[in-house]
Amino acid sequence: PEYKEKLQSLIKKLILDNNSYYTIDRVSNQTIKNILIDIMNNKSIKPLEVNGTKVFGAMDRAVYFNGKDGKVVVSMHSSRVANFETMNGENIKGWYTGDGMTYIYGKDSSAFTEFWPTVDDYHLPGVTNSLNPRGDKSGERRMIGFVSPKSFVGGVETGREAFVGMDMISWNKQTEMKKSWFMIDGVTLAIASNIDSRDGIIHTTVDNRILEDGKIYLDGKQLKEEITIQNPKNLSINFNENYPDENIGYKIVEAPEVVVKVTENKGSWKDIGGSSDKEITKKY
């Protein structure tokens, strides 16, 4: 009873926010469906307002809602939390999902639909990693004695702003770095510093998202083909999707090189440990 009203408000918000499909239509249990219908029809239940920041210290995660339908989630690991988990033959390529992967959500609730079977697992947004080939299920740091030796991972937040930091060493101890995120005033400032590696080519992926009909703009000019920019300063990259007022923007303050391109990725759930071998194609 103590949490009932808040949970009902959260449920209403989640159903209303889903612009991909109507959630209740996909609920087969009639008892649960009736409960959800009652919540949606009850005008005294208001959708939960979620804004600001939250650092989940016990699970090395940080979340930021900017009040304009933008959300940023940072996924990390440490001496307390595994870098990723694979079992029962599932998530066999989840290598970098806890290495600072940064999820950027806009208004489109289908933005990550069929993301995992089609994304290039060496180019996860927010991650700095080697391009050397990995074996399936390799590098899991979950069991006692195998977790990262780094404990300086987490952050502080006021409910409106947050500072998040990650002292990181790679699964094979060949790459070390410090990653920082400042979340304030509708902006997330991401910094990768003190990068030291002996593991071949190291790169950072700013974003890697399903495009559908979206367009990419560099300093106001629409991207027509793959482009490589040497030593960019204050480069603006903007992305819009299916909503006319939506814009997800990036500012590259400084970098040795930036590559921007559109690719067509193919894959199946079976490729990453699922059962379906149906080929899926997505534009990124």
Give names to the regions the model predicted:
Residues E2-Y284:
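Extended polysaccharide-engagement surfaces of secreted carbohydrate-active enzymes
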